[in-house]
């Protein structure tokens, strides 16, 4: 893959083989984020788990202290009073069967998170094959199947994100934008790492945090020393 001039220049700013403290790593990532737009800062954490085993799955949610920097569109499946509650709490789209039909017929994905009341899951279940692969299916573990719609919507809008380990044993999450600056990014980074560490499955053996890498949208990866996160 051909790399751009800015990317290659960025590589000269640090030692790609070295592991840095979280403080130093964020400094470097900000220096290497040279694109002409407000780049997202991404975190990739490789875990010492085997995701093929149900007892070694790692997933959860965390509210980023400073949000993600992007406005999140929330779709809510609810009826009656609960639909009114969702609208009042700031949901972008609220509906029931008619939204299921829209998603099935129009391949409609103009939203980032889907929330549903438990009584609607029979209806939403029809969308499993469509929403599932995109990670959009409501789930009680991530707090997106709930009757407390106001709390769920407000947390999501405030910067609540879901993390889950992929087939390769890696968690990928955004921790904010370049424009946040070092302190806010550091606080978001540490909030995510704290949540991932607390999610360690009892069945996971050996070293849990194998590697931690920070990068901007267009920039190179910077390694963080797992012993120098906090």
Swiss-Prot record:
Domain of life per record: Bacteria
GO cellular component terms listed in the entry, alphabetical order: large ribosomal subunit
UniProt keywords, alphabetically: Repressor, Ribonucleoprotein, Ribosomal protein, RNA-binding, rRNA-binding, Translation regulation, tRNA-binding
Entry GO MF terms: rRNA binding; structural constituent of ribosome; tRNA binding
InterPro entries referenced in this protein's UniProt entry, alphabetically: Ribosom_uL1_bac-type, Ribosomal_uL1, Ribosomal_uL1-like, Ribosomal_uL1/biogenesis, Ribosomal_uL1_3-a/b-sand, Ribosomal_uL1_CS
PROSITE patterns per UniProt: RIBOSOMAL_L1 (PS01199)
GO biological process, one term: translation
Family: Belongs to the universal ribosomal protein uL1 family.
HAMAP family the record matches: Ribosomal_uL1_B
PANTHER family, per the entry: 54S RIBOSOMAL PROTEIN L1, MITOCHONDRIAL, LARGE RIBOSOMAL SUBUNIT PROTEIN UL1M
Reported function: Binds directly to 23S rRNA. The L1 stalk is quite mobile in the ribosome, and is involved in E site tRNA release.
Assembly description: Part of the 50S ribosomal subunit.
NCBIfam families tied to this protein: rplA_bact
Protein name, per record: Large ribosomal subunit protein uL1
Phylogenetic classification of the source organism: Bacteria, Bacillati, Bacillota, Clostridia, Thermoanaerobacterales
Name of the gene this protein is made from: rplA
């Amino acid at each position: 893959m051909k790399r751009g001039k800015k990317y290659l220049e960025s590589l000269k700013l640090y030692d790609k083989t070295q592991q840095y403290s979280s403080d130093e790593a964020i400094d470097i990532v900000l220096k290497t984020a040279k694109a002409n737009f407000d780049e997202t800062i991404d975190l990739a954490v490789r875990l010492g788990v085997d995701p093929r085993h149900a007892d070694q799955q790692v997933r959860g949610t965390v509210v980023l202290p400073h949000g993600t920097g992007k406005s999140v569109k929330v779709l809510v499946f609810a009826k009656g009073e609960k639909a009114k509650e969702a609208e009042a709490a700031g949901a972008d789209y609220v509906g029931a069967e008619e939204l299921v039909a829209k998603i099935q017929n129009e391949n409609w994905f103009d939203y980032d998170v889907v929330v549903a009341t438990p009584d609607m899951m029979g209806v939403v279940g029809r969308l499993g094959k469509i929403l599932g692969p995109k990670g959009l299916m409501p789930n009680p573990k991530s707090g997106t199947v709930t009757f407390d719609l106001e709390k769920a919507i407000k947390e999501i809008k405030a910067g609540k994100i879901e993390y889950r380990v992929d087939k390769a044993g890696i968690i990928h999450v955004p921790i904010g934008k370049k424009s946040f600056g070092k302190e806010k990014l550091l606080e978001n980074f540490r909030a995510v790492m704290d949540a991932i560490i607390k999610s360690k499955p009892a069945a996971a053996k050996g070293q849990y945090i194998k590697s931690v890498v920070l990068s901007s949208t267009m920039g190179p990866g910077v390694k963080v020393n797992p012993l120098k996160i906090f």
